[in-house]
């Protein structure tokens, strides 16, 4: 009988084996529930599995157990805040939002309204994110800096593997609404 695939747990085991980041015990179900309730999102299934198996606590890894609320809120807001920065300073505008308002404050208000409706992204490490959402897994990991969005790994396991192993660019296609439309 073939073992059931557990991509998040496999990624956690791989990260632990690499020994490149300090690890704390994984998050309990109660801790995950508290985080999801406090910040109004749900982890993707593989991300939840990963964090239940281990909690990376090194530089750039969000410490979901000990980081302050403000720190975690900032990390969760960064993708949207980056897009708003690009709207204000780099003339970014998504075609699906309709015509761009002439006044900047109106453009920012409209963009913020639209961005409140796009899928939420959850930090994995540094500027790399996975989409939120229970009953989902296997999404490519996205690197996001303002409106500069790239697929950096085919999935969470591939991301962990790439931390120490140079590899060709992933051939995965981003799978999350809005954010996928702006992958370069």
What residue spans do the PLM features occupy?
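A short acidic (Asp/Glu
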Residues: 35, 134-135
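Glycine-rich, aromatic-bearing surface loops/beta-hairpins
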Residues: 136-183
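Acidic, serine/threonine- and proline-rich low-complexity regulatory tracts
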Residues: 126, 131-133
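Residues in flexible loops and secondary-structure boundaries
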Residues: 49-51, 132, 150-152
């Amino acid at each position: 009988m073939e073992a059931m695939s557990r991509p998040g747990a496999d990624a956690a085991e791989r990260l632990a084996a690499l020994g490149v980041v300090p690890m704390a015990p994984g998050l309990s179900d109660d801790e995950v529930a508290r985080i999801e309730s406090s910040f109004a999102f749900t982890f993707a299934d593989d991300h939840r599995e990963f964090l239940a198996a281990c909690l990376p606590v090194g530089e750039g890894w969000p410490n979901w157990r000990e980081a302050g609320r403000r720190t975690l809120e900032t990390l969760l807001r960064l993708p949207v805040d980056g897009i708003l920065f690009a709207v204000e300073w780099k003339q970014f505008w998504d075609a699906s939002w309709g015509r761009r308002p002439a006044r900047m404050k109106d453009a920012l208000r409209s963009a913020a309204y639209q961005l409140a409706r796009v899928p939420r992204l959850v930090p994995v490490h540094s500027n790399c994110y996975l989409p939120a959402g229970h009953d989902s897994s296997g999404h490519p990991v996205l690197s996001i800096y303002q409106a500069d969005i790239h697929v950096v790994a085919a999935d969470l396991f591939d991301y962990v593997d790439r931390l120490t192993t140079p590899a060709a660019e992933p051939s995965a296609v981003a799978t999350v609404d809005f954010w996928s439309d702006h992958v370069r």
